[in-house]
């Protein structure tokens, strides 16, 4: 009984599921041991996908925002959202890289959404509500499972193979994943933090996760003003 109790305490300390609205994942330093593991609500092949998140960093080098690998050793980049400052972003779908030229951004919160439809192969990248020219990747395929979904590192193997030069340093918040392609109207709802519109695969409102190394959850202290785009302000947490 004592061993069972100790094991339960260990699990409770290493695995959490909670509403993280108003909070961030903080990755304070370059490292290969600091990262967050996200647990999907459902494990299944994904023929359609949308991922949205907010990020805040001063990094000027390449870094991963979200890495999804499968147990297939040939699919360490089944889905990868990879930033290449100052003006490129790469989206990997089943190992195929799709490079987008994007506007350079200042040091402020950035909202990013990526969607992929397997029937058409169309990949969309939205940054702060702006849709960049679309591309086509891996038509008629699917993203397999089981999956390892990690933030803070880029996986070169299932759950590992990290490179400190690709690690994320900064803050990430409002992470959501859907098993379908969001419409432009849905993208706008997510951009403006509509509390009634949350991911059905991963939801920041009910997130099961593990933090490793120096990664922590912290209250969100900054927000990005959207005044120059829309004459509005995004919601801030203090």
From Swiss-Prot:
Gene Ontology CC entries for this record: extracellular region
Record carries keyword Disulfide bond: yes
S-S bridge residues: 52-113
PTM remark: Cys-89 or Cys-223 or Cys-236 could be involved in interchain disulfide linkage.
CDD domains given in the database record: PTX (cd00152)
Modified residues (Pyrrolidone carboxylic acid): 17
Chain residues that bind Ca(2+) 1: 76-77, 154-156
Compartment list: Secreted
GO molecular function: metal ion binding
Pentraxin (PTX) domain residues: 21-223
Required cofactor names: Ca(2+)
GO biological process, one term: acute-phase response
Record-listed Ca(2+) 2 binding positions: 154, 156, 166
Cofactor note: Binds 2 calcium ions per subunit.
Keyword list, A-Z: Acute phase, Calcium, Disulfide bond, Metal-binding, Pyrrolidone carboxylic acid, Secreted, Signal
Self-association state and partner proteins as the record states: Homodimer; disulfide-linked. It is not known if it assembles into a pentraxin (or pentaxin) structure. Pentaxins have a discoid arrangement of 5 non-covalently bound subunits.
Function text: Displays several functions associated with host defense: it promotes agglutination, bacterial capsular swelling, phagocytosis, and complement fixation through its calcium-dependent binding to phosphorylcholine.
UniProt similarity note: Belongs to the pentraxin family.
PANTHER family: C-REACTIVE PROTEIN, C-REACTIVE PROTEIN-RELATED
Protein name listed in UniProt: C-reactive protein
Gene that encodes the chain: crp
